[in-house]
Protein backbone atom coordinates (compact mmCIF):
# COMPACT_ATOMS: atom_id res chain seq x y z
CA UNK A 1 0.00 0.00 0.00
CA UNK A 2 1.35 3.42 -0.93
CA UNK A 3 -0.12 6.57 0.57
CA UNK A 4 1.05 10.10 -0.16
CA UNK A 5 -0.10 12.92 2.10
CA UNK A 6 0.13 16.40 0.63
CA UNK A 7 -0.66 19.75 2.16
CA UNK A 8 0.64 23.06 3.40
CA UNK A 9 2.93 23.32 6.44
CA UNK A 10 0.88 22.78 9.59
CA UNK A 11 -1.96 21.02 7.75
CA UNK A 12 -1.59 17.84 9.82
CA UNK A 13 0.26 15.55 7.42
CA UNK A 14 2.53 14.24 10.18
CA UNK A 15 -0.41 13.70 12.51
CA UNK A 16 -2.33 11.78 9.87
CA UNK A 17 0.76 9.74 8.97
CA UNK A 18 1.22 8.77 12.63
CA UNK A 19 -2.38 7.57 12.84
CA UNK A 20 -2.06 5.57 9.62
CA UNK A 21 1.14 3.88 10.88
CA UNK A 22 -0.71 2.84 14.07
CA UNK A 23 -3.41 1.06 12.03
CA UNK A 24 -1.46 -0.36 9.08
CA UNK A 25 1.97 -2.06 8.86
CA UNK A 26 3.51 0.52 6.53
CA UNK A 27 6.56 2.73 7.15
CA UNK A 28 6.34 6.49 7.65
CA UNK A 29 8.87 8.20 5.41
CA UNK A 30 9.15 11.97 5.83
CA UNK A 31 10.69 13.55 2.74
CA UNK A 32 11.15 16.79 4.67
CA UNK A 33 13.27 14.99 7.26
CA UNK A 34 15.22 13.28 4.48
CA UNK A 35 15.91 16.64 2.81
CA UNK A 36 17.09 18.28 6.04
CA UNK A 37 19.40 15.33 6.77
CA UNK A 38 20.85 15.47 3.25
CA UNK A 39 21.79 19.16 3.43
CA UNK A 40 23.57 18.86 6.80
Curated annotation (Swiss-Prot):
Catalytic activity, EC: 2.7.4.3
Family annotation (SUPFAM superfamilies): P-loop containing nucleoside triphosphate hydrolases
Catalyzed reactions per annotation: AMP + ATP = 2 ADP
Positions of region (NMP): 30-40
Chain positions recorded as ATP binding sites: 10-15
Subcellular location(s) per record: Cytoplasm
Binding residue positions for AMP: 31
Entry GO CC: cytoplasm
InterPro entries: Adenylat/UMP-CMP_kin, P-loop_NTPase
Any one Gene Ontology BP term: AMP salvage
Family of the protein in this entry: Belongs to the adenylate kinase family.
Name this protein carries in UniProt: Adenylate kinase
Gene it is expressed from: adk
